[in-house]
């Protein structure tokens, strides 16, 4: 399973709209800028100033130990914000949009998130685009999430017969050809292909159908190829979603028995800005 070309859009618009109900735009303290590959200290200073602002209400330390602890906390926050700023949406080859959320906006965002779906509408305005390559059996589950998601897929109907069918065309990340076949007091492990000619026999059959169809253009061969194609077949889709979709998917699927959902949740945690605060609740 692969995730490629992840892009995140519209933090600025979502956070601005978040403040519309109370006309509190003047309280916004987040920063958004376009970085055109310039090594400008201004960007770093902006991030570090934002990091310090999280601690403006903290009392002055009374001891050296308290000062050291405060300095460490500020440094941790600054480093975190710097990491978040690096996870950015690329526009063209040399321009990058970066977002750093200030403490005022973060406090309001968390309060709205805790209030439930009717209050956290701003999450629906943070958009994500990603290319996902996954097996058909996972896509069948993903397709239950229809509202707010759109996917453009590579075509099995049009392109299935255009390239050789090999094991690489299927999901095999956790494939194990040794399975416990019999349910008895002393279960034994047997090679799966000894019983159902998988995977070599199945691959040979599919490839033979593909070749025969290309030779004859007889659609009966193509139909049998479609009929017997396993659910492990890998398909790539360009998917657009929003943070509210992703929040629902993450919390509903994080303990799912399909390992592909675990990979999906790891992508959310590791690749999406502010996922800990807005999606996973791990902040």
Language model features with spans:
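Family-specific signature for flavin-dependent thymidylate synthase
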Residues: 1-283
């Amino acid at each position: 399973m692969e995730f490629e070309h992840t892009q995140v859009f519209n933090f600025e618009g979502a956070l601005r709209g978040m403040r519309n109900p109370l006309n509190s735009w003047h309280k916004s303290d987040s920063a958004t800028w376009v970085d055109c590959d310039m090594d400008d200290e201004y960007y770093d200073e902006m991030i570090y100033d934002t990091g310090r602002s999280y601690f403006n209400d903290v009392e002055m330390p009374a001891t050296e130990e308290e000062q050291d602890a405060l300095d460490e906390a500020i440094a941790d926050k600054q480093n975190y914000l710097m990491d978040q700023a690096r996870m950015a949406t690329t526009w063209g080859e040399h321009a990058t949009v970066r977002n750093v959320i200030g403490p005022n906006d973060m406090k309001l965002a968390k309060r709205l998130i805790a209030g439930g779906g009717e209050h956290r509408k701003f999450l629906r305005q943070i958009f994500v685009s990603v290319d996902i390559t996954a097996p058909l059996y996972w896509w069948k589950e993903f397709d239950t999430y229809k509202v707010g998601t759109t996917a453009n897929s590579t075509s099995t109907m049009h392109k299935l017969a255009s390239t050789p069918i090999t094991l690489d065309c299927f999901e095999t990340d956790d494939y194990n050809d040794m399975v416990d076949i019999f349910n008895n007091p002393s279960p034994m492990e047997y090679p799966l292909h000894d019983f159902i000619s998988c995977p070599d026999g199945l691959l040979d059959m599919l490839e033979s159908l593909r070749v025969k169809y290309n030779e004859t253009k007889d659609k009966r061969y193509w139909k049998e190829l479609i009929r017997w194609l396993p659910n492990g077949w890998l398909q790539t889709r360009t998917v657009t979603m929003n943070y509210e979709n992703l929040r629902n998917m993450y919390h509903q699927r994080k303990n799912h028995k399909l390992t592909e959902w675990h990979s999906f949740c790891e992508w959310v945690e590791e690749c999406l800005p502010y996922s800990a605060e807005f999606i996973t609740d791990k902040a």
